[in-house]
Amino acid sequence: MNRLSKRKKILNCIDKSVQYNIADGLRILQETARVKFVENVDVAVNLGINPRRSDQNVRNSVVMPHGLGKKIRIAVFTQGESNVVLARRAGADFAGLEDLCQLIKTKGCTGFDVFIASPDVMNIVSQLGPILGPKGLMPNPKMSTVTQNLTDTIRNFKLGQVRYKNDKNGIIHAVIGKINFNISCLQENLEALVFSIYQVKPTQFKGIYIKKIYISTTMGRSILIDKSSLNVLIH
């Protein structure tokens, strides 16, 4: 009862109009977590861009310095025995071409988190667009998932590389780790994400680029973060 009362008291003290120091905000998330599974820590970055303008849309990827706390399952589209062996040695859970395409056609995405492809097989992989596209899993050079460098790409995703792009409202949604992570690790993951977003600021954009940053758990309330509490220079 005391634990529930403490949690309720903390929740009641959250002011949606207040910008919280990042460490304080993360601490509140940890103290109010109540579900029986280990929740993700989610981030919503509100950008000042006009998402209807193609030259202002933002997409990129970043390797989280402390990972994401989950095993990433990777499938690689490539041909030739040497490339298949290379991909598997780098950590791919499945590597191939015709057999992988057939697997997806018959069973869907089959639990894979990331699909990577060699450039020379994209003419075949593109036929899977109706299956992979709606789930955001279609290999794309802009997201570093169509590449000649299979080894480094696979290893980066295994380490916790996050792909992101703004939605129709100009908001970027991403996961920065698990709620049971150390606060400093979550903060450094968030700072890596924000810095990456700032690096791909559209060249023609004028105004406030990163307007607001919210953090939340999978099932919890969102908390507005004070941007100046991050160890990243942003505007």
From Swiss-Prot:
<keyword id="KW-0694">RNA-binding</keyword>
<comment type="function">
    <text>Binds directly to 23S rRNA. The L1 stalk is quite mobile in the ribosome, and is involved in E site tRNA release.</text>
</comment>
<dbReference type="InterPro" id="IPR023674">
    <property type="entry name" value="Ribosomal_uL1-like"/>
</dbReference>
<dbReference type="GO" id="GO:0006412">
    <property type="term" value="P:translation"/>
</dbReference>
<dbReference type="GO" id="GO:0019843">
    <property type="term" value="F:rRNA binding"/>
</dbReference>
<dbReference type="GO" id="GO:0003735">
    <property type="term" value="F:structural constituent of ribosome"/>
</dbReference>
<dbReference type="GO" id="GO:0022625">
    <property type="term" value="C:cytosolic large ribosomal subunit"/>
</dbReference>
<keyword id="KW-0689">Ribosomal protein</keyword>
<comment type="function">
    <text>Protein L1 is also a translational repressor protein, it controls the translation of the L11 operon by binding to its mRNA.</text>
</comment>
<keyword id="KW-0687">Ribonucleoprotein</keyword>
<comment type="similarity">
    <text>Belongs to the universal ribosomal protein uL1 family.</text>
</comment>
<keyword id="KW-0810">Translation regulation</keyword>
<dbReference type="GO" id="GO:0006417">
    <property type="term" value="P:regulation of translation"/>
</dbReference>
<dbReference type="InterPro" id="IPR028364">
    <property type="entry name" value="Ribosomal_uL1/biogenesis"/>
</dbReference>
<dbReference type="InterPro" id="IPR005878">
    <property type="entry name" value="Ribosom_uL1_bac-type"/>
</dbReference>
<keyword id="KW-0699">rRNA-binding</keyword>
<keyword id="KW-0820">tRNA-binding</keyword>
<dbReference type="InterPro" id="IPR016095">
    <property type="entry name" value="Ribosomal_uL1_3-a/b-sand"/>
</dbReference>
<protein>
    <recommendedName>
        <fullName>Large ribosomal subunit protein uL1</fullName>
    </recommendedName>
</protein>
<comment type="subunit">
    <text>Part of the 50S ribosomal subunit.</text>
</comment>
<dbReference type="GO" id="GO:0000049">
    <property type="term" value="F:tRNA binding"/>
</dbReference>
<dbReference type="InterPro" id="IPR002143">
    <property type="entry name" value="Ribosomal_uL1"/>
</dbReference>
<keyword id="KW-0678">Repressor</keyword>
<dbReference type="InterPro" id="IPR023673">
    <property type="entry name" value="Ribosomal_uL1_CS"/>
</dbReference>
<dbReference type="Pfam" id="PF00687">
    <property type="entry name" value="Ribosomal_L1"/>
</dbReference>
